[in-house]
Amino acid sequence: MLLHIPNVLNAEQLRIVRERLDTAGDAWVDGRATAGYQGAPVKRNQQIAEHTPIARELGDVILASIERNPLFISSVLPNQVYPPLFNRYEGGMQFGSHVDGAVRVLPNGVKLRTDVSVTLFISDPADYDGGELVIEDTYGVQQVKLPAGDMIVYPATSLHQVTPVTRGVRVASFFWVQSLVRSDTQRAMLFDMDTAIQRLNATNADDAARRSLVGIYHNLLRTWSEP
C-alpha cells in the first residue's frame, strides 16, 4: 500500500527543521556511508550523520508528529520506528534503483525489520527540478513529489529510486518502520476496515453492526500482529 499523508509537519516545524539543516555544516556527510552493498554503487547524495545531536533533535520533532497522526498510525500500525535520517540532493545527485535492506540495527542494538519505508518532504517542490521518488509497486510505477511537510509511506519491499536533481536542493527525511503486521496486504485490509469504521462513526449507522465490525478489526489485528 502506497499512501500520501499530508501536513505531517506544520509551517513552524518546517521552518525550524530547515534552518537547522541549512546550518548543519560538517554534519552533512557522504550518503554512501549508510548504504548497503546493493545501494552504495548507485547512491549519490548527502546525509546528516547518524546519531549526531542534530539528527536526534530533528528526528524527535518528526517522531512526535507521527505519534499524533491518526492516518500514520492506522495505515502503518507501527511497532518500532528507526530514528529519522535526513538527506540532501543537488547538482545532479541521485539514488539509483534499489530495494531497502531488510534489517536495520537500532542504537540500542535491537534489530528492526523494515516493513514500511517512509519519506517526509522538507523542500518545497517549486524549489528544485527532478528529485522525484519513483516507486515500483503492484499497480505500476508511481512518481512522488509532495509538498513540504507531506509524507509518503510504502512497502519496504518496493523497488524505488530518486531521480537526478537538476536545479535547486531537495531535502527530505526518511526512515523505516517495523509494523505490528508484517504483511502489506493484511495492513492494507486493516487500514481499509478502520477507515470504513471511522466513516460509520460519523454517521447514524446501526450501532450493533458498527460494534461487530470493530470486534472483527481487533480480532484480525490480534491474529495477524507480531508484537
From Swiss-Prot:
Record-level Gene Ontology MF annotations: 2-oxoglutarate-dependent dioxygenase activity; iron ion binding; L-ascorbic acid binding
UniProt-listed Enzyme Commission number(s): 1.14.11.-
Alphabetical list of Gene3D superfamilies matching this protein: q2cbj1_9rhob like domain, Rabenosyn, Rab binding domain
Amino-acid positions noted as binding 2-oxoglutarate in the UniProt annotation, renumbered to this chain: 170
Cofactor note: Binds 1 Fe(2+) ion per subunit.
Class of this enzyme: oxidoreductase
InterPro entries membership: Oxoglu/Fe-dep_dioxygenase_dom (IPR005123), PKHD_C (IPR041097), PKHD_hydroxylase (IPR023550), Pro_4_hyd_alph (IPR006620), Pro_4_hyd_alph_FE2OG_OXY (IPR044862)
GO biological process per UniProt: DNA damage response; intracellular iron ion homeostasis
UniProt-listed SUPFAM superfamilies: Clavaminate synthase-like
Domain Fe2OG dioxygenase: 80-179
Pfam families found in the cross-reference section: 2OG-FeII_Oxy_3 (PF13640), PKHD_C (PF18331)
Residues noted as binding Fe cation in the record, renumbered to the chain: 98, 100, 160
Cofactor dependency: Fe(2+); L-ascorbate
Key words of the record: Dioxygenase, Iron, Metal-binding, Oxidoreductase, Vitamin C
Record-linked HAMAP family: Hydroxyl_YbiX
Protein name (record): PKHD-type hydroxylase Bxeno_B2756
Organismal lineage: Bacteria, Pseudomonadati, Pseudomonadota, Betaproteobacteria, Burkholderiales
